[in-house]
């Protein structure tokens, strides 16, 4: 992960949580790099890949009128997600499912884990977190109740539940891939790319396709593929690391 991050951003700073003592403890590992900063920090998760830039922009907007902005989602199947204790757009606490009362388990607005706030405030709150809970861990979520008791305001920003899907198993990885492919198919068709059998065409994260291109069934576009305008990709083609020029026809 560190190597991949440095390829994308050579100046990135890496810290490691040697012992898994909870999400609060994990964030605390970055305190020596960020703790004295008066700047905002955005806490994201590597296994939650679908959060949109527009959603981050909403968090930034909410942060302008509150001390902390929290990303949540409303779901019919809250399961083991933490529940948000709210009053309108204000959040007064987050309760993990395993520590929740039956009444709290009935809450449908859940925590995504994504938080935006000023670095020094976040780390001051983390310093006050205890581990007296069902997992004996330091929950980052406890910061919100501590903030409320100290007079700080935490605001709720809601997003689509699909944006918060995590990848913690091979089954969830397959589900995430399915969501990704479905979104890319819609994206390209809206841009004027003709997919003759959309469910049989597979894209990569960096695929680029020009308007007017026709892609037939059972096509795989591996990484580093650019297809310019008005090309035709025949059925059963597998492309990778290539550029297809305008008006070209490519077959398997």
How should each PLM-predicted stretch be described?
Residues 11-13, 90-93, 153-155, 194:
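Conserved beta-strand segments of alpha/beta enzyme cores
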Residues 16, 45, 72, 158, ...:
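Short loop/edge segments at beta-strand edges and connector loops
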Residues 1-44, 48-58:
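Conserved N-terminal catalytic core of the sugar/cofactor nucleotidyltransferase
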